[in-house]
Amino acid sequence: MNSNEKAINSLSRRVTSEVAMALLCLALTFIFFHSAVFPRTKTFLGGYDNTYQYYPWMHKLADDWRALTPPLWDFSVEAGFPFPGEWQTAAFYPINILYVWLTGIPTPVKLDVLILFHFAAAMWGMSLFLRRRGVKRWPSLFGGAVFCWIGPVAIRASWQANIFVGLIYLPWVLYFFERGLAAKNAWRSSWTGLAGLALALSLLAGHPQPFIHNSLMLGFFAVFLLFEKRTPGLSWTINLWRVASALLTVAVIAFLFTYIQLASSHEYFARAYRWIGLSNPVKALQTVVPLEIYNRNNLSIPDLVSIYTGHSSAAEGGTLYLTITALVCACFGLGVPGTWRWFALTITGFILLVALAGNTTPFGWLAYRLPLLNMVREPVRILYLYQFCFATLAASGLQMALNGIPQRGGRFTIFVIVISIFACEARQNGSSWWASTNSPFTADQAYRKTPLITFLEERNRADPGMYRVLARPKDLIPPNSGDIFPLSTVLGHRSSMLIAYFDLLSRDWSLSSQALDQVGARYVVTDKPSEGLTFLSSFDGLLLYERPAARAVFRWSGSPDQAGSGTIGAVNWQRNGVNLQIATNQPRKLTFAEINYPGWHVRINGVATAIDSRWPHFMSVTVPSGTSTVQWSYRPWWLTPGMCCWLLGAVILTAMKLSALRERH
């Protein structure tokens, strides 16, 4: 057997072994979380954001991408908004796109399975990282379980799936980066490029927080490797340049793959308020969180004992409990020789100080003023980095214990016993974060087609997209219902809102508001009788009213009486545009009650026509006399450059890999 055949056989064995490891992670994940699959009694889609954001937005994403059309604009919520601009929609996350292509329009069951695949990826990535750090196969699996089966990571899956998905890329980023740094030319190693791709995916998954904290941890890890992997005989300057150039490669690759998201979100946030549930919303590009908000969701000093009691009063998954089994193993891990334990302890201490926020003086004051960290609204969200460090120590501790057992079968038996006890503890103390499939707050129950929804659908079919529904309170119909059912709502559930739309509604929130007339709020769902409205029907205690003064979404400016049939004809709604036929005996201004936003274009009878931008709220255009076809389309400037950046990033990664193969031969 020649050297080439030996190399091929060796590679084949490694690939086969790693595929088996990945399948084992998948199997263990599905066994541990079996209640989400069979028999399906629990679901991850029970938290408010998962039910009312993640589920309907995945519907919108699937509907558009399955038609090979990027989901650029959402007509169904508020007066329309740029769908990718609100980055929690994860409109350009490749895994979501591939999944809906393969499985179709998502159901709660399908999304639970997608979340489980990410759990398995987290476990596998953690195992790879730990094995790279010298931990054996079975303890590395245990470390992967500690990282994601309980604690801040698992809790986030039930509350905000898009944040959870971003968290799981942390071990992958560090694993790829360490492998890249071991290459001869770290800055052009394909492993370093993959670290940049993994970091980019943590942003594309739908939230900036994992990207910020993953980047922070990568920086800490790079400094650690600078000292641990320093090449003897080389100056500090050369070693520093080696690490810095690798980080630069990661940054460039990450930028190329996230550019499309960053560009769309920057354009949107420049025109939006953030945290609209607050009494005084802030401009979305105000990246530093107000101090009173920053100190609202943090750990308290008594919460520190949750490491063994499991009880914490902190919101947002602010717990230190990762089971007694893992705690004992982590204590053993502190006895493992080497510098990693000191690095893990140092990072853990830093993370706890940040999570305590205003409860520590003066560090809380200092942490609030640290760049990047003060961009995250809830300091406790950084605790998954504590969980990561804890998991590495637990895996090292189990490794040390297994090293004392000479028989291979004995080591495997102890591993099975330890991970089984850990799984029982995690199920007992972590399963309460799941929601029962019978809960009215789950996506299964919240988006059932009720008689009220059916009635509103029928009204919408009579005038497609011409009027909107207002619910008071807004949860009387599921927020973002328009992404699932054919209807449009005045309000949705998002953390931000376009300033022009917010300011328009804020003029008068009463049901007789002229602002509601302007946005086309014709139907009102309420739980209390309302004077001055036309009663239509009642549905299970909910009252449906009609607002006769509501203007249609398409109308003639300044003349409500001329919006009848024969003047504005059939409206054909498309995924990122709308076409309509109109007829008028003189030139008139046609108003489209959709928010005036960059990227909209109009053609009248095939001729490009300027949009009147004097009115900041809605769009209008002057149409000539006679019969005309008006075509509105949303084509943002950043789409083509963003796709080109994706392509360029893929080309660079491919070139890196081919270069490595040539050097090897």
Predicted regions and their residues:
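Active-site-proximal, structured, solvent-exposed surfaces of multi-pass membrane proteins
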Residues: 54, 491, 551-665
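Membrane-interface helix-loop-helix junctions at transmembrane boundaries of multi-pass membrane enzymes
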Residues: 14, 230-245, 329-362, 408-409, ...
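Membrane-embedded helix bundles of polyisoprenyl
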Residues: 25-28, 121-133, 137-228, 243-265, ...
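Start-transfer (signal-anchor) and selected internal transmembrane alpha helices
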Residues: 1-36, 238, 242-251, 411-418, ...
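Membrane-interface helix-loop junctions at the exits of transmembrane helices
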Residues: 30-40, 65, 94-109, 138-160, ...
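Extracytoplasmic
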Residues: 277-283, 420-585, 591, 595-597, ...
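Active-site lumenal/periplasmic loops and adjacent helix-entry segments of GT-C-fold
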Residues: 35-133, 138-169, 286-294, 302, ...
